[in-house]
Design a protein with these regions (language model features):
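Generic beta-sheet signal
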Residues: 53-57, 137-141, 187-189
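Hydrophobic/aromatic beta-strand patches that form the interior of the parallel beta-sheet core
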Residues: 55-57, 86-88, 110-112, 190, ...
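C-terminal regions of RecA-like/P-loop NTPase motor modules
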Residues: 1-21, 31, 228-348
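Conserved inter-motif catalytic segment of the P-loop NTP-binding fold
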Residues: 60, 71-72, 76-173, 177, ...
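The Walker A/P-loop phosphate-binding site
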Residues: 2-108, 126
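Solvent-exposed alpha-helical segments within well-ordered globular domains of core cellular machineries
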Residues: 5, 36, 40, 71-74, ...
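Conserved NTP-handling cores and scaffolds of large molecular machines
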Residues: 11, 42-45, 76, 80, ...
């Protein structure tokens, strides 16, 4: 009997296995969304997507955090027709229309209202404990940033005006306990969170809830935004995903996603910045864009900015060039960036 076999036999834990054969490394489910640059932000690859583990979407109010969470959860449920969403709700700001917008059948959503961190902790751990690895479940928490601790609520009931030092500790415990379950049972958890500005001459956004979230999360996004204007009229927003932490993507990467009032998320937004930087597209004249033949240098038909948001503009680039590899090298950990991504292209 080899040393490996002896150690494996002596282990008291049922999931012990050789690393190269471990299902926790070789059978990781990764579900793509319909938005290529969201897949890049999650995994570093256009063909990647939402993976098991904790993903935190943080930002100020009205920064599309819940919608990003539902977009990912909707993709998971579309990919797995038998999947169920476990939706923990402390904000009650997601009407039925939000779910329908992302193709989510609300009869497959278990809605659990919560009022404090301890309620969330006890219920979530209880649910995860009873699930099997083959159960297809996606968990969404909206939001942890708005959750009080049980002590804070009790103090308010008893008219005590004292500082609450237990909330960060409770959140740290919640994610410390849930992280192994998410990995071992192949479950993605998407948590919406808030940010605050640190004090200083050059303040930066800080994810609320303490350091426990940073330790446990596989992905942390801090979401910013710019107005999408036509003249003086606001048509929507250019949201910028700032990758604060990732197991797959280079930290501090900035990925823009455009959302309009009328059409919702522009699926192919964010790609133009990369294509221009890598030479897969050019700007032949002000306000016009075109694809470029990589072998001959021939410039394709010119289109306006709106035309670059159409599938027809990108299909030839993905099919006939190495643009996917370029994006992977640009954003994924373990590769050297090929170009500097400073500019975010917006409609002129």
């Amino acid at each position: 009997m080899s040393i490996m076999d002896k150690l494996k036999k002596n282990s008291k834990l049922s999931h012990t296995s050789v690393l190269s054969e471990s299902k926790f490394f070789t059978e990781k489910d990764m579900v793509p969304t319909d938005v290529p640059m969201i897949n890049v932000a999650l995994s570093g690859s256009v063909d990647g997507g939402l993976a098991p583990g904790l993903t935190v979407l943080a930002g100020p109010s009205k920064h599309f955090k819940t919608s990003f969470a539902l977009l990912m959860a909707g993709a998971y449920m579309k990919h797995h027709p038998d999947a169920v969403m476990l939706f923990y709700d402390s904000e009650f700001g997601s009407p039925d229309s939000y779910f329908k917008q992302f193709g989510i059948d609300t009869s497959r959503v278990l809605h659990t209202p919560i009022t404090n961190v301890e309620e969330l902790k006890f219920d979530l751990i209880g649910q995860l404990e009873e699930l099997d690895r083959n159960d297809k479940v996606v968990v969404v928490i909206d939001s942890i940033g708005n959750l009080a601790s049980k002590k804070e609520l009790e103090d308010a009931k008893n008219e005590k005006s004292v500082a609450d030092m237990s909330r960060a500790k409770a959140l740290k415990g919640l994610f410390r306990m849930s992280t192994p379950y998410l990995a071992m049972k192949n479950i993605p958890l998407i948590a919406v969170n808030h940010t605050y500005q640190e004090i200083g001459l050059f303040p930066k956004a800080i994810v609320s809830g303490g350091t426990g979230i940073y330790y446990s999360a596989d992905n942390i996004w801090i979401i910013g935004r710019q107005q999408d204007k036509k003249g003086t009229e606001i048509q929507g927003y250019h949201f910028v995903i700032n990758v604060e932490k990732s197991r797959y993507v280079k930290e501090k990467s900035k990925i823009p996603i455009t959302v309009s009032w009328e059409g919702g998320v522009k699926s192919y937004s964010g790609l133009l910045d990369c294509a221009l930087a890598g030479g897969y597209a050019v700007k032949p004249s002000n306000g016009w864009y075109a694809t470029v033949d990589q072998s001959s240098g021939e410039v394709g038909p010119k289109v306006r900015y709106d035309g670059t948001l159409d599938k027809s503009f990108w299909d030839p680039i993905f099919a006939e060039t190495d643009f996917k590899d370029f994006l992977k090298k640009q954003y994924s950990i373990g590769h050297q960036s090929l170009v500097e991504m400073d500019e975010i292209v917006v409609e002129e």
